[in-house]
């Protein structure tokens, strides 16, 4: 066999070995992420690499980064808590699950035109940075939505106030940043998540409601 053909055959074999080995490497990497996450405290998780937090939320690293940048740009900053940022992230997750919304993935929901002020309508990109606070807010939002600690009907917010909102909306929360509202919905998803929900029993969250950073962790926002 000519030398060129031998080299070509060897290169092809090496490429095939690399391709076949990628799933095993990825699985080993994700297993390491899972061990890191499960064996850590929240204070340790807060400072973990972005890719580990993304894995914990079931997102690709690129989607998680985009999500964190939107949360950073849309959510209010506070030295005391990350409540506003968590509720922005939870609003996105609630929209993904509500059957009334046309998008099912986080990235599609974030890039839907006209939904988020910090996302460009034409390019679907954002120029905001991200912080440890905004990354952690996403982690906590996933946790709270899964545990039904935040009303699944919370799918709207703005920074201007409750005045002028549609009559379909129910005032839900204000923490000094955004005004969050509930939307009456009887879709299959919302009904299954909160079967006993009654709009007449909905009340504003108290002013002292707060979602704190892990013990010993100070503010990290841009």
Where are these regions (language model features)?
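Bacterial extracytoplasmic/cell-wall-associated proteins, especially those involved in peptidoglycan
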Residues: 30-222
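Gram-positive cell-envelope targeting signals
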Residues: 1-33, 220-221
